[in-house]
């Protein structure tokens, strides 16, 4: 069926016949298919040299939003292929990676203009082979973890610390005290993990075998 689609400011404004809007650019798409934009849930483009902060078992305090490169030609290629939105993820060198960036691709814009505002919060985790291969062998003989049991212990230790940190802040806030000098020390790493415990941040996790998936859940 022959139909017009009116697009304003990057969004569909109307669908119908014989639509017009002053000086709008007209694209004749007869014989072609029009589909919704593709959402890429797992992407590493536009963050060259900023993917992995793998020096520690956890880098939950860092965010991919700080290293988005709006001049990466892959943005243009993604748009040409129909990708409109992506989740840009930290790498998988450590069990607990950095915070993700949710972006809507626009060519020729500043990095800040690509970031979704008030979007759901995400963070990158990794299990099994990703972490083990980053740490394994003679190059890193003393790096922890090097096994699946070590990866599991990392999550146990960090979430226990995050639970204690979150409880300390909740007790302080409930006390009604206004003296910030007596407040718990702010820790962005544990604060991020506490958001997961409070269902305010979601995990995107590289996974391999059933046992470790069940472990994380």
Protein language model features and the residues they cover:
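Glycine-rich nucleotide phosphate-binding loop and flanking beta-alpha elements
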Residues: 13, 19, 45, 93-94, ...
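A structural micro-motif
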Residues: 24-25, 60, 201
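Polyanionic/metal-chelating signatures
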Residues: 79-217
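Histidine-rich, glycine-flanked metal-binding segment
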Residues: 1-35
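Metal-associated gating/positioning segment near the N- to mid-region
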Residues: 29-101, 109
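A fold-wide structural signal in alpha/beta-hydrolase
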Residues: 4-6, 39, 84, 144
């Amino acid at each position: 069926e022959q139909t017009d689609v009116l697009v304003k400011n990057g969004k569909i404004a109307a669908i119908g016949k014989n639509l017009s809007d002053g000086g709008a650019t007209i694209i004749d798409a007869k014989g072609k298919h029009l589909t919704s934009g593709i959402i890429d849930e797992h992407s590493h483009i536009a963050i060259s040299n900023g993917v992995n902060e793998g020096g520690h078992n956890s880098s939950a305090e860092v965010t991919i939003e700080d290293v988005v490169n709006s001049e990466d030609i892959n943005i243009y290629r993604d748009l040409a292929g129909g990708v409109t939105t992506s989740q840009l993820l930290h790498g998988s060198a450590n069990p607990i990676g950095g915070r993700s960036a949710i972006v809507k691709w626009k060519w020729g814009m500043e990095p800040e203009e690509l970031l979704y505002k008030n979007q759901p919060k995400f963070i990158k985790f990794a299990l099994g082979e990703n972490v083990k291969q980053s740490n394994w062998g003679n190059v890193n003989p003393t790096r922890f973890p090097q096994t699946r049991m070590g990866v599991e212990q990392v999550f146990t230790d960090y979430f226990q610390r995050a639970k204690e940190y979150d409880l300390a802040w909740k007790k302080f806030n409930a006390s009604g005290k206004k003296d910030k000098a007596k407040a718990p020390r702010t820790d962005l790493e544990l604060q991020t993990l506490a958001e997961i415990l409070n269902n305010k941040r979601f995990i995107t996790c590289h996974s391999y075998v059933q046992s470790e998936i069940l472990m994380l859940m």
